[in-house]
Amino acid sequence: MVQRTRWRYSAIAHNYNSCRPMELGAGIAVGAWDGVWARARSAEFVAATDMGDPVYSAFMRYDDSAPLHAAVAADWATYVAADFNGGPFKYSIFPILYSFTASLVVTMGLTVIVFFNVRTKPHRGVPKLLRVAAVLACGNLLTFVVRAMMQLGRDHAEGVVPMNHILDMLWTDTAFNTVDILAVLILQLCQVQTVMRFFTRFQEKRLISLCGILLAVLSQVLWAIPPYSEAVSNHFMPLDDDKDMDVLPPFVYLVRIAQAGSYASFVLMHVFAKKKLCVQSVQMFLLTVLTVVVVVLQPAFFITDVTNVWIDNLSEIFSTTCYMGSTVIVWEWSNRLSILEARRQAQSILGRPVYEDEEQGYNFARYALKIQTALTSKSDEGDTTSATTFAAPRSARFEGKGGPQSPVYVQEGEQQAVMAFNKRMGTRALAHHVLDSIIYYTDKVVVKGLGNLSASLPSKTSSATSVRGRVRKRIGLEGANDVFVYRTKDLVFDSDEDIPRT
């Protein structure tokens, strides 16, 4: 059997006499065609082997068939009864075929879910990455299964059913390893985006994005070094006398276990935090249970991979399937959970929480002024006289995709909202801006208690400052620096007994 990773176990040498040339002595050699035979004084027989191990014979045997050679029968009995590196004989070619086909069916099912069930809005990037990773993983696994079946067909035509040849195809195929590493990298990046959705503050999302992307790229680069080194040198490096590469595979495997455990911890933490929404319906409850199973299965598989050598033989296929399942199912669960959470926030009084770092870029100010401008321009088209409407506010409805929304009150007489943002100013304009700011804050702090505000110096930025002041007033930021002094006062109310009765 092919030994790939010496750090997992020590290779045990098995010497089978039937796998070496055997001297048969004198006899008659019968050909494959009728009537073709020859008498031989001595003959040497070389049996077909599976990289040094006996192979399972695909020839039909009957009661009157010639018995096997004594050495062949003894070695085959030893091979079937032994429990060595590859496990007992039950871990032979047929369970491996079942594993290949089962992984292929699961991967194809997840690919169908990605293309037909995963929403592309409001997160457009992750669904596209999921589709690319699903196509790569499914196509790569399908190509390998077809090649394995064709190789088994050729071996069966020769009367043997080997196992190590198929595993050797899995380990030494550079194209398969390249596509697999790329697919797993994309799936890990999608997992980073999934974890980012669990947090609301931008600073937390940036930190998770930075650390997650660096870990994903680093782990995949380190994971790709051993197989590509083996492909370049045309041999399995960890089995040579050079033991420098023995330290890298276990380290990378520990990194993968840590990544899978961290991802599962984040998902389980979010399940616990949103437990009321997770059990809101039967469908959501079942999807939550499936999510917990797939995220726990991934680190459990890596740990089992270390302890069970037979699973190590198929780790490249199993790990890709586990990565795909833990990414696609968790993303779909997160989509449905976000819909339920948005619906609950829309029905509540406070709505969704808004943090200070979300104000970068004036997102909420842009949205508020956009709505106000649309309402003001729409109402001005139907008004013929404005002099009689300056005193009272009016209400207008905003028509959206979901029908008429609640009325928004706009004060008549105000000028149309114009958004003014900080732009790069020249040296002269910057000097005027600094001087105006000094005078403004001096008026606020010193002169406000003595009289009217002093007039600002004329400058080219006075109009921009006034426009910016109107914008701050409309969005409720004009009183941010005001200081108010209060004092308490006792109020005495008449009791019911003091009220005269008639």
UniProtKB/Swiss-Prot annotation:
GO annotation (BP), single: regulation of vacuole organization
Subcellular location: Cell membrane
Protein name stated in the entry: pH-response regulator protein palH/RIM21
Native source organism of the sequence: Eremothecium gossypii (strain ATCC 10895 / CBS 109.51 / FGSC 9923 / NRRL Y-1056) (Yeast)
Function in brief: Required for the proteolytic cleavage of the transcription factor RIM101 in response to alkaline ambient pH.
Extracellular side: 1-95, 153-165, 228-250, 305-313
Sequence ranges on the Cytoplasmic membrane side: 117-131, 187-206, 272-283, 332-502
Membrane-spanning parts: 96-116, 132-152, 166-186, 207-227, 251-271, 284-304, 314-331
Region feature Disordered, mapped onto this chain: 379-404
Entry's family note: Belongs to the palH/RIM21 family.
The entry's keywords: Cell membrane, Membrane, Transmembrane, Transmembrane helix
InterPro entries reported for this sequence: PalH
Pfam families: PalH (PF08733)
Membrane topology type: Multi-pass membrane protein
